[in-house]
Structures are given as structure tokens and as C-alpha cells.
Amino acid sequence: MAHDFSPATSTEALVRAGQHSQLRHQEEASGVAGTGRLASTAFTIAFSREAGTYGAAIARAVGNRLGWPVYDHELLQRVAEDLGVHQTLLESIDEKHVGWLSECLESFSSAPTVSEFAYTRRLVEAMLSLAAHGECVIVGRGAAQVLPAATTLRVRIIAPLEYRIEAVGREHGIAREKAARQVEATDRERRRFIEEHFHFDPSDPTNYDLVLNAARFSQAECAELVIAALDRFRARHASSPERMQKAL
């Protein structure tokens, strides 16, 4: 029987191996190797967000409150350094599904390029490495789908479409029609990226621990709710680590 070594399959295998490696690292670091228990401080918050919800700003507010580093575009810098390319080279494929045709055409170019799969592989490795040490906030890029559920608080920020269009229009000083196109395009690209590489529907609320409507709460209130959820997440883990372990 032929084996499928497609980029998507390879990425999934990397994610699974990385998750188990991360948990072993955390057990060893906390002196509980082989017990099924995890280090009490090895938690990560992973944000997923619809376009125009100020998800990145909320994530930074959470990081500031906790004193944790926040990785958004900073992830691109880490991946660029690993690949030995300039960060701007990755921005055209960041959270986008470029497709095989684009990659084939780029292969004929003399300019330095990075394939979508190479970027995604290094991205997954970078996120797993960060989460292995815990106490960090990661924005987008499949973190909520990639990182182990047992040690990751997975947050989704949403809002009604009209709210998001108005937010993007204000932020960029553009007309409503252009803002609407930008919101639709960004949502589509992010969705395709997650579906193609990780086989998850990013809009499915069951993939998250907390879903917040940014139109109903201020950024500061959203940050407070996330931190409150983290406190409960930690408390539940402390009281029943075996139960949390089963979340994997």
C-alpha cells in the first residue's frame, strides 16, 4: 500500500511528535517524569481571532497583565532566523494557504523563496518550543490547534461582521467596501491555512476553551476574562492533573 507523505500528513506527524516531546520535557523539568503529571507553570495561552476583533491587542493586554511574552509577528522573526531568510520573505505566506501552483511557479524564480510547507514546519517547531517552557501567549498561526490541550488555554475572539468591518475601516482609514473585502479575505486565508495544514475548522467553538465576543466587552474586559479562565484552568489542573491529561 502506498503511503501518503503529503505536506499536510507530514505536518500532522510533526505536531503529534512535538506534543508528546513537549509533555515529556515538562514532566522531566518538574521532576515528575513517568507520573502523567505536568509542571504547574508550563501553561500557554493560544489566541485565535477573526479579522477586526482586536484579538492581537487583547492578547498583548493579557501578556502585559501576566508579565508573559507575546508572540505574534515575533514568531515570523524566529522562523526567518531558522530558515536563514529575511522576515519580509515570510510575510506573503504568513497564515495563508499559497497553494501548489504558486510554489511551482516560485521554483522557477532565481529569487530566494520559502515554500509554504517549510514555513509551516518551522512555525510548528517554534510554537512547540515556546510552549514547552510555558508562560507565554501565542497569537494565531494554528497555535490553538497545534499545542497540547492539557497545557494550553485556547481562546477565540469573535464579533459580528459589521462590527469587524467598521473596526478595520477605522484602523486603516479606508472605506467600508474596502474594509469589507479585507475582512473577508483575511478570514478566508486564515481559515484555509488552518484547514489545509491542521485539518481543523477554526470557526468551530468546540475547538476552544473560551470564546469571547469583542463587540460585547472592551479589550480590558476581554483580557480580564481570559486571565480569570486561566486561573480556573490552573486550579482544575492542580486539583485533577489526571483529568487534564486526558484532554490530549
Q: At which residue positions do the language-model features occur?
A:
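NTP-dependent small-molecule kinase module
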Residues: F200-L248
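A conserved segment at the C-terminal end of the G1
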Residues: A56-W68
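Walker A (P-loop) phosphate-binding motif
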Residues: R37-T53
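Extreme N-terminal, non-catalytic leader segments
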Residues: M1-A42
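ATP-dependent small-molecule kinase phosphotransfer cores
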Residues: V79-E135
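Conserved phosphate-donor/acceptor-positioning beta-strand/loop module used by diverse small-molecule
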Residues: A150-R170, R176-E184
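Short beta-strand-centered segment that lines the nucleotide-binding/catalytic pocket of NTP-utilizing
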Residues: P69-E81
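Small-molecule kinase domains that catalyze NTP-dependent phosphoryl transfer to phosphate-bearing small molecules
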Residues: A8, A17, W100-E103, A175-Q219
